[in-house]
Amino acid sequence: MKIAVLPGDGIGPEVTREAVRVIEALGLGDIEMKEAPVGGAAYKAYGHPLPPETLEIARLSDGILFGAVGDPDCDSLERHLRPEQAILGLRKALTLFANLRPARVFKGMEDFSALRPEVAGAIDLLIVRELNGDVYFGEKGFRTAANGDREGYDVMSYSESEVRRIAHVAFRAAMGRKKRLCSVDKANVLETSQLWRDVMLEVAKDYPEVALEHMYVDNAAMQLVRAPGNFDVVVTGNLFGDILSDQASMCVGSIGLLASASLGERETEYGTFGLYEPIHGSAPDIAGKGLANPMATILSAAMLLRHSLGLEVAADRIEAAVAKALADGVLGRDLGGTAGTTEIGDAVLARL
């Protein structure tokens, strides 16, 4: 089993270090972790945010543990050389098409949510977002109409095969949870969404144990605030998923607890190849000070073990240890506590 560790910039190296410690402490044996530079750190050393050697290490792995990229020193570089291009390059080169964003309020964390504690406490959902299609990747541009009026346009489109592959990811995720899947679209006005809904219904026949429901995106946004506990797995397109996943993040209350996965088409010997990262950025203002909360990265490592290495029990152990540490009051500064990066890592290790 091979894990590519790409720490990146800012607090990336600090938080990935704690996640690596947790993986090592599990005593799983046959896991090889190989570190490689990425982002601004890679540009400064090799002249490119995603060196060929780093990409090759990523390709040969079963899963990637990614820290964060972003360096103020690189802000004046040409766009293709900026640190952020590393993650975009990895997604494209490795055909990562399915973003998994869990949103869970751990016991004792209810007051950090923007919602009432009794509502927030019920949140435990997973948003599955398609990454490679939709309006972000359609034809776009500017044009001048016959009357001289300037127009901007972006074409929203999905192919049946694109919808089908994300549908299978979502149904499989639902099979491992409460067997409930909500497909979010806008089929009452968009042809793209009508195709989306048709394909979801077809794929549902392969998963008779999963209860599928459909919801318009405007209603989904309301229900996510009104009764988030009613959701288990949510699957949606790129644009809607971009918005809903950030909304779900605020329902949780702190990005320091939010992990994510981007899965590809390749099946490894143990699971599905993917890239795993916290949703927070590189936070250069606190880099190197031991202040960053590594829990999101540790939870990302748990997702890697579950989805790419097939180590469900090990992933459960990590998540339980994080939950116990939070319940015991081990809080980073993002949660109003005083615990530093290493202290939080030690607390999780002690509760494995």
Curated annotation (Swiss-Prot):
GO CC annotations on file: cytosol
Protein residues bound to NAD(+): 281-293
UniProt keyword list: Amino-acid biosynthesis, Branched-chain amino acid biosynthesis, Cytoplasm, Leucine biosynthesis, Magnesium, Manganese, Metal-binding, NAD, Oxidoreductase
EC number: 1.1.1.85
Keyword flag DNA repair: no
PROSITE patterns, per the entry: IDH_IMDH
Cofactors (names): Mg(2+); Mn(2+)
Amino-acid positions noted as binding Mg(2+) in the UniProt annotation, renumbered to this chain: 218, 242, 246
Cofactor notes: Binds 1 Mg(2+) or Mn(2+) ion per subunit.
Gene3D superfamilies per record: Isopropylmalate Dehydrogenase
Main location: cytoplasm
Site (described: Important for catalysis): 136, 186
Domain of life: Bacteria
InterPro entries found in the cross-reference section: IsoCit/isopropylmalate_DH_CS (IPR019818), IsoPropMal-DH-like_dom (IPR024084), Isopropylmalate_DH (IPR004429)
Location in or out of the cell: Cytoplasm
GO biological process: L-leucine biosynthetic process
Residues annotated as binding substrate: 91, 101, 129, 218
This protein's pathway: Amino-acid biosynthesis; L-leucine biosynthesis; L-leucine from 3-methyl-2-oxobutanoate: step 3/4
A GO term for molecular function: 3-isopropylmalate dehydrogenase activity
Catalyzed reactions: (2R,3S)-3-isopropylmalate + NAD(+) = 4-methyl-2-oxopentanoate + CO2 + NADH
Subunit structure, as described in the record: Homodimer.
Membership in a protein family: Belongs to the isocitrate and isopropylmalate dehydrogenases family. LeuB type 1 subfamily.
Chain's role: Catalyzes the oxidation of 3-carboxy-2-hydroxy-4-methylpentanoate (3-isopropylmalate) to 3-carboxy-4-methyl-2-oxopentanoate. The product decarboxylates to 4-methyl-2 oxopentanoate.
Name the UniProt record assigns to this protein: 3-isopropylmalate dehydrogenase
Organism: Novosphingobium aromaticivorans (strain ATCC 700278 / DSM 12444 / CCUG 56034 / CIP 105152 / NBRC 16084 / F199)
